[in-house]
Amino acid sequence: MENIIKIDNLYFQYPHGEDEEPKLAIKGVSLEIEEGSFSAIIGQNGSGKSTLAKNLNGLLLPSKGAVYVSGMDTRDEDKIWDIRQTAGMVFQNPDNQLVSAIVEDDVAFGPENIGIDPVEIRARVDEALDAVKMGKYKRKAPHLLSGGQKQRIAIAGVVAIRPRCIIFDEPTAMLDPRGRKDIMEIIEKLHREGITVILITHFMDEAVKADRVVIMNKGEILLDGTPEHVFSQDELIRSARLDVPMAAEIAIYLRENGIDVPPEVVTAERLKEFVCQYK
């Protein structure tokens, strides 16, 4: 598989006042994201994960180093719209992403702005709304919807552009448990359909669903690997003020007490399967 995103020795520093000490939000990060993969980037508030996300499609530009999206340098102004069409982004607060008074018009906004034919736009809108199970709300006003429904509309707006990659920047942070579950099911479905997913989250039970987990701490990469590898490093994870998933924590406890628990037991489903063997 080829890489859809390459991050090369990225540094990022936010603008600061004359009396303020400069502080790097990202410090020398290098990553390669394979096309079709599902990566979760986690970390405490202030770890740099959302700053990293915004560098991935040119919302922020490197202070040093480079980010390439399908070979395009995010600093190339002539390529910025191609970059954002390739790597779409869904934000934490859907209200920041909804722009129209009617749901179907909101989903159509992106395709309209990249010059898609009106007949094709209608087809894309219907397809995108069906993908997020919101087809029956197409003529509703977004402000009348729940937080989870609004987030689904925001996702549909990105899907309608048909990006190869979608960056989700804490998309469930403002939702209740049911809303979180619904959004994660949509994200997993999009990944199964071939879209590259980059999920920024602080929920460990979401991160374990990825193929790869990257832990950010103080602007740097602390850990990078499969969920099985990353969540077995419980002491290192706790040093970054994070918790391991409950299932992984139970598995670690069982291993410490002489039970041979396989390394892939990091989710509730895998733990249940393992425990059921002892019935």
PLM features: residue spans?
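The feature captures the beta-strand-to-loop junction immediately N-terminal to the Walker
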Residues: 42-44
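Conserved ABC ATPase "signature" region
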Residues: 119-137
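Catalytic Walker B motif of ABC-type/P-loop ATPase nucleotide-binding domains
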Residues: 166-169
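Conserved ABC transporter NBD signature motif
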Residues: 65-75, 83
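Conserved ABC ATPase signature
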Residues: 141-145, 149
